Amino acid sequence: MTQSATAHYFVESPSTGALVLGAVGVVFGDIGTSPLYALKECFSKEHGIAFSPDAVLGVISILFWAMIIVVSIKYVVFVMRADNDGEGGVLALMALVLRTVAQRSRKAKILMMLGIFGACMFYGDAVITPAISVLSAVEGLEIAAPQLSQFVIPITLVILAALFLIQRHGTAAVGKLFGPIMTTWFVALGALGILNLVQAPEILKSINPYYAISFLVEHALQAFIVLGSVFLVLTGAEALYVDMGHFGARPIRIGWFVLVMPCLILNYFGQGAMLLHNPAGVENPFFLMVPELLQLPMVLLATSATVIASQAVISGAFSLTSQAIQLGFVPRMRVLYTSAAEIGQIYLPVVNWLLLVLVIGVVISFKKSENLAAAYGIAVTTTMVITTFLAAVCMRNVWKWDPALVAVLGTSFLLVDLAFFAANLLKIAEGGWFPLLLGSAAFFMLMTWYSGRKLLRARSLEDGIPLEPFIAGLLAHPPHRVEGTAVFLTGSIDTVPVSLLHNLKHNRVLHERVVFLTFVTRDIPYVDDDQRVSCKDLGGGAFILKSEYGFKETPDVQKVLDLADRKLGMHFELMETSFFIARESVIPSRLPGMPMWRESLFAWMHQNGAKPSDFFQIPANRVVELGTKVEI
């Protein structure tokens, strides 16, 4: 096994059973905690649906078929086939389909912007999921221990704050418990469902799609509004695709079809049966279906499950941001590894604290899970619509499927997604504006950074001196040579690094060995170590060293030098090597490019990004930073 192959979730290849257990603990947390609030929200008084046995049968029928069509058929059967070297998620899918279109074409730009916008919507989900999940679980105290009702929000805030505070220490130790806890959770969901099903088995009639269609036709507009709440059972479906690289498609499919889907369906049918038997249970169908003696233990188990679901979303936000950094859409940030065994476990302090502030603010502002339910959904449906569109492009361009088949599948899935999307649009005024605003702000920042970097590269190429002719001329009339190795980090091997020009201008020396090191991010998640480094000898002790990384990897200078030693015979003595880095100060100008205010925003982002020496993990005492100003 190569070193890069270990960059998946586990360093050693575990058995399928272990992967299934791991997937149950991580992948299904979000969708697995939806029973806490989904059905309760479907019968919210604001929807204007008169409570009746037929309404219960209709809503349960819609829930059932939505789960079958969107999760089981669309995601598990079709979308999970679209892997980028084993990785899933909207960014991996975007990178996959971009290979099939001409670079810099209008089509490529549209696909790229769709992928980035879909990814940005995830940040809205990353704020809402921990808040609504933990809050809805702790609200069980209102049923199990009414005297503690006033402490619901404080307890929620303490749990969430603790969750974010432990992120810097990693979750490797407690992560081993995630699988068993979530397995217990799903078994409990199924058992509760069966317990209530036997009291009103007529709820099983909901399997017939007639009841779903009849409900939609009879209630028309009100039923359309209810679709926005029905969608809550599907939140977390995207996680099945996103986490595919951690566990593999097969373990996720086994976990879904063997354990998760049956238990979720049993629980939703059980909640429906309880409502047929006890209509007053509509106040909180989930906790009122639990026998009184077990209500408090169930609150504790539900809280554990929602914390695990929140952890999965937080880890997803770290992973997504790390990918966006490598793809050039986000400024460099400190990326810390929290586990020596599980390379996928990373921690980004900036993202963590920003999420903490937003999540705490959301809980304090919205106060109840039913209020948060209105804000939930719009961001997820947006990502789902984009994933469906990109998957259709993949079917046609990558898999070369028949256009008629692609049209039928793509249109069918898109119509279902758009119905849920339109229903969620009705919730914008009630709170849906928040994740939309958050996602749109993130998209604007990412595109500003991407456009600014393009401008910066263009200016550097315009003003730059071709590297190879310059080195040839320099070696013909060399300055004083000094012992040791100089490594010049550069974004382009076509032009002379500004740091070299400044070194020659001020120090008037050239090291006996000069290495121009550049990092290239490819459109695949991982690069094999055998293909990671390549070298070009320019003569006279000057070399171009190119290191390639996947978009799920973080560059590490020390590892690159070790690899160059092993693979290319280029030995580096760290204490005799100096690393020269140009620290660019961006100056907004009226040159053609972006508006001045947007260039100022880019300059601020550039200034506040992590130092290259920190990001590339270069020993601080071996770094020489040389400042330069660049107008854009």
Curated annotation (Swiss-Prot):
Membrane topology of the entry: Multi-pass membrane protein
Keyword annotations of the record: Cell inner membrane, Cell membrane, Ion transport, Membrane, Plasmid, Potassium, Potassium transport, Symport, Transmembrane, Transmembrane helix, Transport
Annotated localization: Cell inner membrane
Keyword Membrane: yes
Reaction(s) catalysed (UniProt annotation): K(+)(in) + H(+)(in) = K(+)(out) + H(+)(out)
GO cellular component terms given for this protein: plasma membrane
Domain of life: Bacteria
Residues that span the membrane, as ranges: 19-39, 59-79, 110-130, 146-166, 178-198, 213-233, 256-276, 298-318, 346-366, 373-393, 403-423, 428-448
InterPro entries: K+_transporter, K_trans_C, K_trans_N, Kup
GO molecular function: potassium ion transmembrane transporter activity; symporter activity
Pfam families associated with the record: K_trans, K_trans_C
HAMAP family found in the cross-reference section: Kup
Family per record: Belongs to the HAK/KUP transporter (TC 2.A.72) family.
Its biological purpose: Transport of potassium into the cell. Likely operates as a K(+):H(+) symporter.
Protein name as it appears in the record: Probable potassium transport system protein Kup 3
Organism: Cupriavidus necator (strain ATCC 17699 / DSM 428 / KCTC 22496 / NCIMB 10442 / H16 / Stanier 337) (Ralstonia eutropha)
